[in-house]
Design a protein with these regions (language model features):
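Positively charged n-region of N-terminal signal peptides that target proteins for export
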Residues: 1-4
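Bacterial N-terminal signal peptides
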Residues: 7-15
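An extracytoplasmic/periplasmic, membrane-proximal ligand-sensing/linker region
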Residues: 26-28, 260-322
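Short beta-strand->loop
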Residues: 108-119, 154, 176-180, 198-199, ...
Length: 322
Protein backbone atom coordinates (compact mmCIF):
# COMPACT_ATOMS: atom_id res chain seq x y z
CA UNK A 1 0.00 0.00 0.00
CA UNK A 2 2.81 2.34 0.89
CA UNK A 3 4.60 1.78 -2.40
CA UNK A 4 1.38 2.28 -4.33
CA UNK A 5 0.78 5.57 -2.52
CA UNK A 6 4.31 6.79 -3.31
CA UNK A 7 3.93 5.82 -6.97
CA UNK A 8 0.60 7.62 -7.16
CA UNK A 9 2.10 10.71 -5.53
CA UNK A 10 4.99 10.76 -8.00
CA UNK A 11 2.59 10.46 -10.92
CA UNK A 12 0.51 13.30 -9.51
CA UNK A 13 3.58 15.51 -9.13
CA UNK A 14 4.63 14.73 -12.69
CA UNK A 15 1.18 15.66 -13.87
CA UNK A 16 1.33 18.94 -11.94
CA UNK A 17 4.69 19.74 -13.56
CA UNK A 18 3.27 19.08 -17.00
CA UNK A 19 0.23 21.23 -16.33
CA UNK A 20 2.43 23.99 -14.92
CA UNK A 21 4.55 23.93 -18.06
CA UNK A 22 1.53 23.86 -20.35
CA UNK A 23 0.19 27.07 -18.81
CA UNK A 24 3.61 28.71 -18.35
CA UNK A 25 4.08 31.61 -18.15
CA UNK A 26 0.99 33.05 -16.47
CA UNK A 27 2.71 36.14 -15.04
CA UNK A 28 5.74 38.37 -15.52
CA UNK A 29 9.13 36.65 -15.61
CA UNK A 30 12.31 38.27 -14.27
CA UNK A 31 15.41 38.01 -16.43
CA UNK A 32 18.42 38.76 -14.24
CA UNK A 33 21.33 40.41 -16.03
CA UNK A 34 24.19 40.29 -13.51
CA UNK A 35 25.81 43.47 -14.79
CA UNK A 36 25.03 47.17 -15.04
CA UNK A 37 22.86 48.52 -17.84
CA UNK A 38 24.39 49.49 -21.15
CA UNK A 39 27.10 46.90 -21.77
CA UNK A 40 27.05 43.91 -24.14
CA UNK A 41 25.72 41.57 -21.44
CA UNK A 42 22.83 43.94 -20.75
CA UNK A 43 21.97 44.46 -24.42
CA UNK A 44 22.12 40.71 -25.03
CA UNK A 45 19.84 40.08 -22.06
CA UNK A 46 17.30 42.59 -23.35
CA UNK A 47 17.31 40.98 -26.80
CA UNK A 48 16.58 37.63 -25.15
CA UNK A 49 13.86 39.07 -22.90
CA UNK A 50 12.16 40.52 -25.97
CA UNK A 51 12.27 37.13 -27.72
CA UNK A 52 10.65 35.39 -24.76
CA UNK A 53 8.00 38.11 -24.38
CA UNK A 54 6.96 37.83 -28.01
CA UNK A 55 6.93 34.05 -28.25
CA UNK A 56 5.50 33.19 -24.83
CA UNK A 57 2.91 35.95 -24.43
CA UNK A 58 4.01 37.39 -21.06
CA UNK A 59 6.39 40.17 -20.10
CA UNK A 60 9.98 39.10 -19.48
CA UNK A 61 11.52 42.02 -17.60
CA UNK A 62 15.26 42.59 -17.23
CA UNK A 63 16.58 43.28 -13.73
CA UNK A 64 20.18 44.46 -13.58
CA UNK A 65 21.91 43.03 -10.51
CA UNK A 66 25.56 44.01 -10.87
CA UNK A 67 28.56 43.60 -8.62
CA UNK A 68 31.48 41.24 -7.94
CA UNK A 69 32.06 40.36 -11.58
CA UNK A 70 28.45 39.33 -12.11
CA UNK A 71 28.44 36.86 -9.24
CA UNK A 72 25.94 38.74 -7.04
CA UNK A 73 23.22 38.53 -9.66
CA UNK A 74 24.15 34.95 -10.47
CA UNK A 75 23.87 33.98 -6.81
CA UNK A 76 20.43 35.57 -6.61
CA UNK A 77 19.35 33.59 -9.67
CA UNK A 78 20.75 30.35 -8.24
CA UNK A 79 18.74 30.86 -5.03
CA UNK A 80 15.50 31.83 -6.77
CA UNK A 81 12.47 29.55 -6.79
CA UNK A 82 12.84 26.93 -9.55
CA UNK A 83 9.49 27.74 -11.11
CA UNK A 84 10.53 29.44 -14.35
CA UNK A 85 9.73 32.95 -13.14
CA UNK A 86 13.35 33.91 -12.53
CA UNK A 87 15.98 33.16 -15.17
CA UNK A 88 19.40 34.62 -15.87
CA UNK A 89 21.23 35.82 -18.96
CA UNK A 90 24.84 35.08 -18.05
CA UNK A 91 28.12 34.40 -19.80
CA UNK A 92 31.45 32.63 -19.57
CA UNK A 93 32.58 34.82 -16.68
CA UNK A 94 29.60 34.07 -14.43
CA UNK A 95 29.01 30.47 -15.50
CA UNK A 96 32.48 29.01 -16.09
CA UNK A 97 35.33 31.21 -14.82
CA UNK A 98 33.90 32.67 -11.60
CA UNK A 99 34.86 29.79 -9.24
CA UNK A 100 38.54 30.42 -10.00
CA UNK A 101 38.31 34.01 -8.75
CA UNK A 102 35.76 33.79 -5.94
CA UNK A 103 36.45 30.87 -3.56
CA UNK A 104 33.31 31.69 -1.52
CA UNK A 105 31.14 32.06 -4.57
CA UNK A 106 27.98 30.58 -3.07
CA UNK A 107 26.93 28.77 -6.23
CA UNK A 108 28.27 26.11 -8.59
CA UNK A 109 27.84 26.99 -12.28
CA UNK A 110 27.46 23.33 -13.22
CA UNK A 111 25.32 22.09 -10.31
CA UNK A 112 23.07 25.03 -9.40
CA UNK A 113 21.59 25.92 -12.79
CA UNK A 114 19.55 24.31 -15.54
CA UNK A 115 20.93 25.28 -18.97
CA UNK A 116 18.29 26.73 -21.29
CA UNK A 117 20.14 27.83 -24.38
CA UNK A 118 23.27 29.31 -25.92
CA UNK A 119 22.70 32.73 -27.48
CA UNK A 120 26.00 33.69 -29.04
CA UNK A 121 29.72 34.07 -28.55
CA UNK A 122 31.55 37.39 -28.59
CA UNK A 123 35.16 37.18 -29.80
CA UNK A 124 37.63 39.30 -27.88
CA UNK A 125 40.04 41.85 -29.29
CA UNK A 126 43.54 42.74 -28.11
CA UNK A 127 43.56 46.55 -28.11
CA UNK A 128 46.59 48.70 -27.26
CA UNK A 129 47.22 52.41 -26.85
CA UNK A 130 47.86 54.34 -30.05
CA UNK A 131 51.57 54.85 -29.42
CA UNK A 132 52.26 51.30 -28.20
CA UNK A 133 55.45 50.06 -29.94
CA UNK A 134 53.81 47.11 -31.71
CA UNK A 135 51.56 46.83 -34.74
CA UNK A 136 50.84 43.12 -34.71
CA UNK A 137 50.75 40.21 -32.29
CA UNK A 138 54.32 39.08 -32.98
CA UNK A 139 55.68 42.54 -32.16
CA UNK A 140 53.44 42.73 -29.08
CA UNK A 141 54.79 39.43 -27.77
CA UNK A 142 58.41 40.49 -28.32
CA UNK A 143 57.88 43.82 -26.56
CA UNK A 144 55.86 42.28 -23.72
CA UNK A 145 58.52 39.69 -22.94
CA UNK A 146 61.30 42.28 -23.00
CA UNK A 147 59.37 44.84 -20.93
CA UNK A 148 57.16 42.74 -18.66
CA UNK A 149 57.87 44.87 -15.61
CA UNK A 150 56.72 48.04 -17.39
CA UNK A 151 53.44 46.71 -18.77
CA UNK A 152 50.08 47.77 -17.36
CA UNK A 153 47.04 45.72 -18.31
CA UNK A 154 43.57 47.22 -17.84
CA UNK A 155 40.50 45.08 -17.24
CA UNK A 156 36.84 45.53 -16.34
CA UNK A 157 37.01 43.84 -12.94
CA UNK A 158 38.01 40.47 -11.50
CA UNK A 159 35.94 37.75 -13.15
CA UNK A 160 34.87 39.91 -16.08
CA UNK A 161 35.29 38.57 -19.61
CA UNK A 162 38.01 41.16 -20.24
CA UNK A 163 39.88 39.90 -17.17
CA UNK A 164 39.60 36.32 -18.41
CA UNK A 165 40.70 37.31 -21.91
CA UNK A 166 43.75 39.16 -20.64
CA UNK A 167 44.74 36.25 -18.40
CA UNK A 168 44.48 33.85 -21.35
CA UNK A 169 46.71 36.16 -23.39
CA UNK A 170 49.22 36.58 -20.58
CA UNK A 171 49.31 32.83 -20.02
CA UNK A 172 49.85 32.13 -23.72
CA UNK A 173 52.77 34.57 -23.83
CA UNK A 174 54.16 33.72 -20.41
CA UNK A 175 54.01 37.16 -18.76
CA UNK A 176 52.55 38.62 -15.57
CA UNK A 177 52.17 42.38 -16.04
CA UNK A 178 50.68 44.84 -13.57
CA UNK A 179 46.90 44.38 -13.65
CA UNK A 180 44.81 47.52 -13.20
CA UNK A 181 41.10 46.96 -12.41
CA UNK A 182 38.29 49.25 -13.55
CA UNK A 183 34.51 49.15 -13.19
CA UNK A 184 33.77 48.43 -16.84
CA UNK A 185 34.97 48.55 -20.43
CA UNK A 186 34.42 52.29 -20.88
CA UNK A 187 36.79 53.29 -18.03
CA UNK A 188 39.41 50.86 -19.37
CA UNK A 189 39.20 52.43 -22.82
CA UNK A 190 39.51 55.90 -21.29
CA UNK A 191 42.65 54.77 -19.46
CA UNK A 192 44.14 53.42 -22.69
CA UNK A 193 43.30 56.68 -24.45
CA UNK A 194 44.98 58.59 -21.62
CA UNK A 195 48.05 56.36 -21.64
CA UNK A 196 47.53 55.05 -18.08
CA UNK A 197 47.37 51.43 -19.26
CA UNK A 198 48.95 49.69 -22.23
CA UNK A 199 46.41 47.12 -23.33
CA UNK A 200 43.12 45.34 -22.75
CA UNK A 201 41.28 42.32 -24.11
CA UNK A 202 37.54 42.81 -24.50
CA UNK A 203 34.65 41.83 -26.76
CA UNK A 204 34.99 43.74 -30.03
CA UNK A 205 32.11 46.14 -29.41
CA UNK A 206 33.83 47.98 -26.52
CA UNK A 207 37.04 49.06 -28.30
CA UNK A 208 35.40 49.26 -31.75
CA UNK A 209 34.63 53.02 -31.95
CA UNK A 210 38.12 53.88 -30.72
CA UNK A 211 39.71 51.54 -33.26
CA UNK A 212 37.59 53.06 -36.02
CA UNK A 213 38.60 56.55 -34.87
CA UNK A 214 42.29 55.61 -34.92
CA UNK A 215 42.80 56.40 -31.23
CA UNK A 216 43.39 52.76 -30.24
CA UNK A 217 45.22 50.02 -32.17
CA UNK A 218 43.67 46.58 -32.74
CA UNK A 219 46.25 43.80 -32.89
CA UNK A 220 44.38 40.49 -32.85
CA UNK A 221 40.95 38.84 -32.76
CA UNK A 222 41.08 35.93 -30.30
CA UNK A 223 39.30 33.31 -32.44
CA UNK A 224 39.76 31.32 -35.63
CA UNK A 225 37.58 33.66 -37.70
CA UNK A 226 38.00 37.38 -38.31
CA UNK A 227 35.32 39.73 -37.04
CA UNK A 228 32.98 41.21 -39.69
CA UNK A 229 33.18 44.46 -37.70
CA UNK A 230 36.99 44.57 -38.10
CA UNK A 231 37.72 42.46 -41.18
CA UNK A 232 41.27 43.80 -41.56
CA UNK A 233 42.38 42.67 -38.09
CA UNK A 234 44.01 39.21 -38.23
CA UNK A 235 43.17 36.49 -35.73
CA UNK A 236 45.40 35.04 -33.05
CA UNK A 237 45.42 31.80 -35.05
CA UNK A 238 46.65 33.56 -38.17
CA UNK A 239 49.42 35.17 -36.13
CA UNK A 240 50.66 31.95 -34.56
CA UNK A 241 49.14 32.14 -31.07
CA UNK A 242 46.13 29.75 -31.02
CA UNK A 243 46.38 29.52 -27.22
CA UNK A 244 44.94 33.05 -27.13
CA UNK A 245 41.41 31.82 -27.83
CA UNK A 246 38.68 33.78 -26.11
CA UNK A 247 35.13 34.16 -27.38
CA UNK A 248 32.97 34.26 -24.23
CA UNK A 249 29.64 32.51 -24.53
CA UNK A 250 26.41 34.31 -23.65
CA UNK A 251 23.60 32.03 -22.54
CA UNK A 252 20.38 31.66 -20.56
CA UNK A 253 19.99 29.56 -17.42
CA UNK A 254 17.31 28.78 -14.82
CA UNK A 255 17.67 27.74 -11.17
CA UNK A 256 18.35 24.04 -10.63
CA UNK A 257 15.15 22.05 -10.36
CA UNK A 258 13.12 24.13 -12.79
CA UNK A 259 10.75 21.63 -14.47
CA UNK A 260 12.15 20.30 -17.72
CA UNK A 261 8.98 21.07 -19.71
CA UNK A 262 9.46 24.75 -18.80
CA UNK A 263 13.13 24.59 -19.77
CA UNK A 264 12.17 23.06 -23.11
CA UNK A 265 9.50 25.71 -23.69
CA UNK A 266 12.01 28.49 -23.07
CA UNK A 267 14.65 26.77 -25.23
CA UNK A 268 12.20 26.44 -28.12
CA UNK A 269 11.24 30.13 -27.92
CA UNK A 270 14.90 31.17 -27.81
CA UNK A 271 15.74 29.02 -30.82
CA UNK A 272 12.89 30.51 -32.84
CA UNK A 273 13.93 34.04 -31.93
CA UNK A 274 17.56 33.44 -32.88
CA UNK A 275 16.40 32.38 -36.34
CA UNK A 276 14.90 35.84 -36.97
CA UNK A 277 16.88 38.07 -39.31
CA UNK A 278 16.26 41.16 -37.16
CA UNK A 279 17.59 39.41 -34.04
CA UNK A 280 20.61 38.13 -35.93
CA UNK A 281 21.40 41.67 -37.08
CA UNK A 282 21.07 43.09 -33.56
CA UNK A 283 23.49 40.50 -32.22
CA UNK A 284 25.87 40.90 -35.16
CA UNK A 285 25.96 44.64 -34.46
CA UNK A 286 27.32 43.73 -31.01
CA UNK A 287 30.13 41.77 -32.64
CA UNK A 288 28.50 38.50 -31.60
CA UNK A 289 28.57 35.23 -33.50
CA UNK A 290 25.15 33.58 -33.14
CA UNK A 291 25.23 29.97 -32.01
CA UNK A 292 24.50 27.39 -34.68
CA UNK A 293 21.14 25.62 -34.17
CA UNK A 294 22.74 22.35 -33.05
CA UNK A 295 24.66 24.18 -30.29
CA UNK A 296 21.75 26.15 -28.84
CA UNK A 297 19.79 23.61 -26.79
CA UNK A 298 19.99 22.78 -23.07
CA UNK A 299 22.07 19.62 -23.53
CA UNK A 300 24.60 21.33 -25.80
CA UNK A 301 24.88 24.32 -23.45
CA UNK A 302 25.45 22.04 -20.46
CA UNK A 303 28.26 20.32 -22.34
CA UNK A 304 29.77 23.70 -23.28
CA UNK A 305 29.80 24.91 -19.67
CA UNK A 306 31.44 21.67 -18.57
CA UNK A 307 34.12 21.88 -21.28
CA UNK A 308 34.86 25.56 -20.61
CA UNK A 309 35.24 24.95 -16.87
CA UNK A 310 37.68 22.13 -17.65
CA UNK A 311 39.61 24.27 -20.16
CA UNK A 312 39.81 27.44 -18.11
CA UNK A 313 40.43 26.10 -14.61
CA UNK A 314 44.11 25.10 -14.93
CA UNK A 315 45.00 28.12 -17.08
CA UNK A 316 43.36 30.70 -14.84
CA UNK A 317 44.60 29.12 -11.62
CA UNK A 318 48.17 29.25 -12.91
CA UNK A 319 47.75 32.77 -14.26
CA UNK A 320 46.49 34.11 -10.93
CA UNK A 321 48.95 32.23 -8.71
CA UNK A 322 51.13 34.51 -6.62
Amino acid sequence: MGRQWIAAALLALAGMGGAQAQDYPVRTVTVIVPFAAGGPADVTGRIVADIFSRYLGQQFVVENVGGAGGTLGSLRAARAAPDGYTIISGHMGTHAAAPMFYPNLGYDPEKDFEPIGLIAEQPELLAVRKDFPANNLKEFIAYAKANEGKLNMGHAGVGSVSYVGCLLLNSAIGIKPTMVPFTGTAPVMNAILGGQVDYDCDPVLGPLPHVQAGTVKALAIATKKRSPLLPDVPTSYEQGLPEFDCAPFYAVFAPKGTPMPIIEKLADALNKGLNEAVVQKRLADLGAEIAEPDRRGPKALGALVKSEVARLTPILKAATAK
